[in-house]
Structure formats: structure tokens, C-alpha cells
Amino acid sequence: MTKKVTKIVAQKRAGRYNIYLDEQYAFPISESVMIKFRVFKGMEVDEQLQAAMIAADDVSKAYTRALDYLSHQLRTEKEVHDKLRDEEIDESVIDATMQQLRDMRLLNDQQYADAFVRTAKRTSDKGPRVIRQNLRQKGVGEQLIDDALAGQFSAEEQIDNASELARKLAKRYHRQAFKTMQQKVRQGMMTKGFDNDTITAAIASLALEPDEDEQWEALVAQGTKLWQRNRKYAFRERMMRTKRSLFQKGFMMDDINRFIDEQVADE
């Protein structure tokens, strides 16, 4: 059944219009859809054309929402898709909207990944593995991630960033036994996403050496707590438990024996 456009009324919202067919309100459309279908007063509209205009308007509205979402920062295809889905937009409309965004070059996961890696290496202490995990969560494909990391985060830059992180971690744990400090530095760097080769190179670049005075102070501080905690045991058991705990914490046995000797002398 064919009807005729008898009235086109602008809505209060800019760029939106109400279409009347045979003097009856029929449907709303955007200005872009009206231009696309060349809608004019007196135009004949059958059911198929009306359905096509309504479908195009659904895409137009979804496209506008996507543009608003993209206006704040770069987004991946998955982020935009999920945003539209969360707004309960039909999947077919989302697919058409996503293609329109691609055609307009408003979605590009490679550019997103490149920018993400550049920002992460400059403003954070994240290594490649954590950056990869972040990009995966945002829906970026493995090959795109590989290309971004290879092009934006060189091996030299990774060692530089890892060295700075190692320096911070060494400072944080400097009151621990030197061996324990080294283990925690390495563990912390692994948690941040650096690989073993990079970690080894970074630690080597710092040329970390134990400070004898600091190590002794740390041993005394921890040893005193252990010595007091173990006072309920017989002397030999107390001594062995304290020694074992200090050794497990990474202190040198010669220093441990010296500490124990001093405790025995004081009692």
C-alpha cells in the first residue's frame, strides 16, 4: 500500500524530523536519512520504502551514539560494539553502524594499539606482557598487538623502563636481605610484564651490591623479633628456629651466627 508524505515537521532536537503520511504521523528520521532517501512533501512511500527509511534511521541514531562515545577518546571496535550492545541496540543495526564507522575511518584497532603502547611505555611501568593483556581485554587481535609492540616498544626501551622499575623496587625492599630483595625485584618486574631476558639485563645494569651496614641492621631488626617470638622454646630449639627463619629470609649464615652469638652473650 502506497501513501504520500503530507507533512515534514522539525523536532525540537536539532537534525530530527517527524514524517506524516496521509496526514497521519508515521515515523521520525534524521536529517541524514531524509537527504539519503530524498524525502520531500508529496513523495510516495510504500511499506518497503518506509521500512528501509526506519532501518536507516536506526543506524543513524546508533551512529550518533557511537560518535559521542568516540568523541572522548580512542576506542577499539570491541569497546564500541559493546557500548552499543549495552544500549540494547539490535545486532544488525550495530553491524551496519560498525561498517559505517570503518568506512569513515573512525575505527582502527591498529592505530589504537600503537597509541596504547606508546602511552603505556611513556607513562607507566608496564612491560609487554601486561600491555598485551590490556589490549586483549579491549578486543585487539594478536597480530595487531604484535605489530604495535614491535613498532612502538623496542628492546632497548624495554630495558630502560625495566631498569627504572628495578631501581624503584630495589629502593622499596632495601631493608630486606639482599637475596630476598633481588628475588622481590625480579618477581615485581615479572608481575609488571617484563620477560626474563629483559629483567636480567635491567638488574645487571644497576650493578646492585649489598650494603653491609644496611644488611646487618635488617638482620638485627628481623632477628630480634624472631628471637623474642621463639623464647617459649628450649634454648637449642629457639636458636635453631631463629637461624632457620633468618636463613630462609635470605641472610648470610656468617651474619646469622654472629647475631645469635650476640643474643646468647646478652642473656
Curated annotation (Swiss-Prot):
Keyword annotations from UniProtKB, A to Z: Cytoplasm
Keyword Cytoplasm tagged: yes
InterPro entries: RecX_HTH_1st (IPR053926), RecX_HTH_2nd (IPR053924), RecX_HTH_3rd (IPR053925), Regulatory_RecX (IPR003783), WH-like_DNA-bd_sf (IPR036388)
UniProt key word Methyltransferase: no
GO CC annotation, single: cytoplasm
UniProt subcellular location: Cytoplasm
UniProt-listed Pfam families: RecX_HTH1 (PF21982), RecX_HTH2 (PF02631), RecX_HTH3 (PF21981)
Protein origin, superkingdom: Bacteria
Chain segments annotated as coiled-coil in the UniProt record: none
GO process terms (BP): regulation of DNA repair
PANTHER family in the record: REGULATORY PROTEIN RECX FAMILY PROTEIN (PTHR33602:SF1)
Similarity section: Belongs to the RecX family.
NCBIfam families: PRK14135.1
Role noted for this protein: Modulates RecA activity.
Protein name, per record: Regulatory protein RecX
